[in-house]
From Swiss-Prot:
Disulfide bonds: none annotated. It holds the Pfam family Ribosomal_L10. InterPro entries: Ribosomal_uL10 (IPR001790), Ribosomal_uL10-like_sf (IPR043141), Ribosomal_uL10_bac (IPR022973), Ribosomal_uL10_bac_type (IPR047865). One of its GO terms (molecular function) is large ribosomal subunit rRNA binding. Part of the ribosomal stalk of the 50S ribosomal subunit. The N-terminus interacts with L11 and the large rRNA to form the base of the stalk. The C-terminus forms an elongated spine to which L12 dimers bind in a sequential fashion forming a multimeric L10(L12)X complex. Coiled coil: none annotated. GO terms for cellular component: ribonucleoprotein complex; ribosome. Belongs to the universal ribosomal protein uL10 family. Forms part of the ribosomal stalk, playing a central role in the interaction of the ribosome with GTP-bound translation factors. Keywords: Ribonucleoprotein, Ribosomal protein, RNA-binding, rRNA-binding. This is Large ribosomal subunit protein uL10. The lineage of its organism: Bacteria, Pseudomonadati, Pseudomonadota, Gammaproteobacteria, Candidatus Pseudothioglobaceae. The gene is rplJ.
Length: 174
């Protein structure tokens, strides 16, 4: 169905807004996917807070110009689906990677992470990045480790003295 000019402008505005607020974008060719597979991809994307859009390439190119997602413009050809993540850098890559495990028909053409183009062969590396919450917990554990070690060391000195005194008392009783 052909879109009229107003509808095209609305699509460009929506995709442009998504591109401006997103931290990562993924481009994948969906040729050969069934409706059921596409529905599964969309539901897994929703679970991961990823927005998927199928847009005509000419409209997508207009929408992505002058945004940090502009780096994926060279791979916009053929029937592609765009995935946008607004918070997690690796979310789009994780959605595509998990979907490809069961459906080989989805072909990732490239990713844009913080304005940098990432080749599709680096999908696994980007997908394995920790989420924001995981990264915070790792940093907190690293920051907490020296404090815990200091606390254990400070507690151990009086405990050693107590054990020595107990041993001396036991020795004198015998």
């Amino acid at each position: 169905m052909a879109l009229n000019l107003m509808a095209k402008k609305a699509v460009v505005a929506q995709v442009n807004l998504l591109a401006r607020v997103s931290v990562s974008i993924g481009v994948a060719e969906y040729c050969g996917l069934t409706v059921e597979q596409m529905t599964n991809l969309r539901s897994s994307a929703i679970d991961a807070d990823v927005v998927l859009r199928v847009v005509k390439n000419s409209l997508a190119k207009r929408a992505l110009v002058s945004t940090k997602c502009e780096c994926v413009l060279p791979v916009l050809s053929g029937p592609v689906i765009l995935g946008f993540s607004q918070q997690d850098l690796g979310a789009v890559a994780r959605v595509f990677k998990n979907f490809i495990k069961e459906n080989k028909d989805l072909v990732v053409k490239g990713l844009g992470v913080s304005g940098e183009f990432v080749e599709s062969n680096q999908l696994k590396r980007i997908a394995d990045l920790p989420t924001r919450d995981q990264a915070i917990s790792i940093i907190m554990a690293l920051m907490l480790a020296p404090v815990e070690k200091l606390a254990r060391t400070l507690i151990e000195v009086p405990m050693k003295v107590t054990r020595v005194v107990e041993a001396v008392c036991d020795q004198k009783k015998s």
